[in-house]
Amino acid sequence: MRLIMNADDFGISKAINLGIIEGFKNGIVTSTTLMCNMETTEHAVNLAKENSKLGVGIHLVLTAGRPLSKNVKTLVDNEGNFLKYDKMVESACIEDIRIEFRNQFEKFLSFGIVPTHIDTHHHVHSIESVFEVVAELAKEHNIPIRHIKAIGEEKYENIKTTTEFIDSFYNLSMIEPQMLINLLDDNMNVDSLEIMCHPGYLDSKILSSSSYAYPRVKELETLTNKEVIQFINEKNIELINFKDI
């Protein structure tokens, strides 16, 4: 089995950025995805450049922070912040989404790095119209998209992706070391597997703005756990990133 352990939310805060790098240096994190509309995006970029073997994709955002684009009125509230998920689904115009996603992608490229792949914050590309915009970018740049089966396998025609994607490594009940070992053991026959994770340290930004806080620290502990690393080595699981699929 070839495993991509992808850490979402790179760029959301300095503490999260540093935690992701810890998971890469001393654990099994192989890949991350960068949020380009955050105050600490450039902090994450600098860390990525110092750790060039870490795969870095783009985490396209519609539901956190503020847009990079002007005049995308269907995406924002009265204060100029992105709408929450449900409101976004009701309000968002596809052309505004296209403008914003392209601006986020151009922002990523402006840092002088090439994204390994695309995924989205809160899996907004599981919405069919949003997926089409993401697919445009993926095809233009010949990069993979995170595999969301609910959108339909036919949507991934001519788009690179992993064989399987797992998002259940999440919440305290599911992120103990043995739970991750069991998850890996159950998928040993899969060719390429991406597991989503959210490791990190905590700071005031996360504590004040994220509903998912303490479990990030626990995830980091599990992703650097000696028993987990030993299991991966014993089972000859190949740790890769999206450049390898």
Swiss-Prot record:
It holds the Pfam family YdjC. Keywords: Carbohydrate metabolism, Hydrolase, Magnesium, Metal-binding. GO terms for biological process: polysaccharide catabolic process. One of its GO terms (molecular function) is deacetylase activity. Its cofactor is Mg(2+). Mg(2+) binds at H59, H121. PANTHER family: CARBOHYDRATE DEACETYLASE, YDJC DEACETYLASE FAMILY MEMBER. This is Carbohydrate deacetylase. It comes from Clostridium beijerinckii (strain ATCC 51743 / NCIMB 8052). The lineage of its organism: Bacteria, Bacillati, Bacillota, Clostridia, Eubacteriales.
